Structures are given as C-alpha cells and as structure tokens.
C-alpha cells in the first residue's frame, strides 16, 4: 500500500508539473494506475475467506483513501483542466465532469476549508470500509430445530451446517436467508432469520451511520449548502431535494392503489394459510417473501426450486457469457489464476476487433 501510494503521488506530481494540454490522457493513465492496484485489493477486502487477508486489504485501502481527494483538490491539475480547449463533445463532457469533481472535492475552497473537506472525505470513506467490514464479518448465526425449517427444499437442508443435536446453524448469507424467507412455513422462524439479517453489523454500525450523517452535513456546510441532500443532487438530473421529493410523491401516488391491492392479496393468502379470518392477519416484513412465493406458485404454476434442475450452474454461466459475446462483440477466455475460493472462475474479456484487442477481466 505504501509503495503504490508513493508511486501514485509521484505520477501525480509529474503530471502537475507538465505544461501541455494532454491532461485528459494523463488523468486517465493515473486513474488506471490507481484502479489496477486498488480494485483487486477492495475485492479481497470484501470476499477473501482468510481473515488475515481481509485485514491486510482493509489496512491497505485505508492508506490509499486520501489519494482520490488529493487528486480532486490539486490546484495545478485543476488549472490544467480549465485551460484545455475541447476537441469535440466527448472532450467537453469530460472536461465538465472533471471541473465538477474538482469543485466538489474542494479545489476551489479556501485553504483551511479545503483541508477540513479532505479530512471529512477521508473519514467518511474509512467509516464506509468499517461499516462493510462489520457486515461481512458479523458472526451472528441463527439456530433452528428441524421442525422450524419445515418447508425448506432437501437440497437447501443438506447444504446447511448442524450442531451436535441436529439443529440447523444458519448464517446470514444470501443463499441461506432468501430461500428461507421464501419457503419456511414457520412465521416465528422467519421472524428470527429476518431480524438477525436486518441487524447485521450490530450497534456499532448505527454509531458509524450517525457519525457519517454529521460529517456529511459539515461537508455540505463547507461548500455553502444547507444540507447534504442539496450538495449530493446539485449535479444530477433532479438538481434539488424538492424535485426528488416531488418525483417520489408522484411515484407513490401512481402505485398506491396497486400496492394496496397486492398487500390485500398477500393478507388473504396468509389468512388462507393460517386458517384465520381474512380481516385479522397482520402482514409483517418476514411474511412478504413467503406469501409472494405462494401466490406466484398458485397463479403461474412456477416453482423456483423445481426450475433449478433445468438450469445447472456451469451451463447457465457459459450460456450467459456466450449470449454476451454475441450481443456486445466481445470474447471471454477463462484463465487459471490465484483465487480466494475454489468456486471462483476467472475470465479475461477481449474485444473481437483484432486491431483493438483491448483486454478486461471479470
């Protein structure tokens, strides 16, 4: 991390000292240099199965965090970008995007405010990393008896860990939680799993969110904005929080009737399933996916679990890649590279046009 940051800063310093107008290409090369190192590290921080690797990646990312703000606050780079005479509409758009990035990053603020803006931006990024880490490494499990897992497919049950008494030990990962909420017949068990999933990250993440909200407000104030919402949407199509709220109100009014009808349908299904008066049952968050799945099966005769047999994973992945090749004029080539889990597959992506042959990767 230290070495890569030093290289990036050296490249940035060299670009700042240049006098020519090819700043767009310089900016692009520097961005690629940073991303080629930073993105794989970010991926490892999120998915590596070894905690030591995740922790090392986290520490590395925290060292790299200040650089993006340093680029956005560079006065020499800002002056170079402003001096560029765009050759075409693409250059004009890129120039405008960069100018806005500089202005939003604090390049035009007085020195004291600029320094504080960098401190705030860096801390917000660190809070985000820690928030994600708390979610990814939450050790919470939900222990259920076999009876509480009634309704679950055999394949799902076979893949779950069990304790010495035969009880299921459920993690909070997507392949565990989503099928359970869709299929488990016990509303009490669904509630346990739903509550655990929605508390993922724990109380610590609530403190991080509170701190981030305060920092965002302070950042908006530094830029002369009344709140972070105004600061965040000023460059976007909506431009103002009022326009966003008006749009959301329009959407809500348009879907109110449909939402009420669908909720009534789900409540009716719950009443039928539980044998209660249709006017009685409350529909809770942990009920929704279960009764949506029941209604879907009854109305369309579609069973997601039954469909799995027709879409084996390996063949489905290859078909999707072949389809993408036809649609986008690209070519996927599988490679053997070091990966963080035995199930991970690596593909290089190439344009089909031979003279370009520009590689990417997934």
Language-model region placement:
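Active-site-proximal, well-structured secondary-structure segments within enzyme catalytic domains
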Residues: 94-96, 118, 123-126, 133, ...
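Acidic, low-complexity proline/glycine-rich segments
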Residues: 1-3, 32-35, 82-97, 165-188, ...
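Substrate/cofactor-recognition hotspot
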Residues: 133, 174, 188, 193, ...
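Second-shell loop/turn segments in exported
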Residues: 1, 103, 176-180, 198-202, ...
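Short, charge-rich amphipathic alpha-helices with coiled-coil/heptad character
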Residues: 39-51, 181-197, 235
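N-terminal helix-rich structural modules
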Residues: 1-152
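Short, 15-30-residue, compositionally biased linear elements
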Residues: 89-101, 202-215
């Amino acid at each position: 991390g230290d070495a890569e940051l030093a290289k990036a800063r050296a490249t940035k310093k060299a670009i700042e000292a240049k006098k020519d107008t090819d700043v767009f290409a310089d900016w692009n090369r520097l961005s690629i240099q940073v991303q080629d190192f930073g993105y794989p590290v970010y991926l490892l921080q999120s998915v590596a199965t070894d905690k030591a690797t995740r922790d090392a990646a986290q520490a590395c990312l925290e060292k790299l965090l200040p650089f993006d703000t340093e680029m956005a606050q560079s006065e020499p780079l800002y002056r170079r970008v402003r001096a560029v005479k765009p050759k075409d509409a693409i250059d004009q758009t890129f120039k405008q995007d960069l100018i806005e990035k500089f202005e939003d990053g604090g390049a035009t603020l007085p020195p004291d405010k600029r320094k504080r803006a960098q401190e705030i931006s860096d801390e917000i990024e660190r809070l985000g990393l820690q928030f994600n880490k708390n979610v990814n490494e939450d050790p919470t499990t939900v222990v259920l008896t076999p009876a509480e897992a009634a309704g679950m497919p055999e394949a799902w049950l076979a893949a779950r860990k069990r304790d010495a008494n035969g009880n299921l030990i459920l993690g909070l990962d997507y392949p565990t939680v989503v099928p359970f909420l869709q299929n488990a017949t016990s509303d009490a068990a669904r509630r346990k799993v739903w509550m655990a999933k929605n508390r993922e990250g724990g109380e610590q993440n609530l403190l991080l969110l509170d701190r981030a909200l305060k920092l965002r407000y302070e950042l908006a104030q530094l830029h002369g904005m009344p709140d972070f919402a105004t600061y965040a949407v000023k460059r976007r199509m909506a431009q103002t929080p009022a326009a966003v709220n008006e749009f959301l109100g329009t959407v809500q009014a348009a879907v109110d009737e449909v939402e009420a009808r669908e909720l009534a349908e789900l409540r009716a299904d719950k009443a039928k399933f539980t044998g209660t008066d249709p006017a009685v049952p409350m529909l809770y968050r942990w009920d929704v996916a279960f009764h949506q799945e029941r209604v879907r099966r009854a109305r369309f005769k579609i069973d997601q679990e039954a469909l799995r047999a027709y879409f084996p994973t390996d063949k489905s992945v290859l078909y999707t890649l072949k389809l993408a090749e036809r649609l986008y004029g690209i070519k996927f080539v599988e490679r053997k590279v070091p990966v963080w889990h035995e199930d991970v597959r690596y593909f290089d992506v190439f344009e089909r046009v031979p003279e370009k042959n520009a590689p990417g990767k997934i």
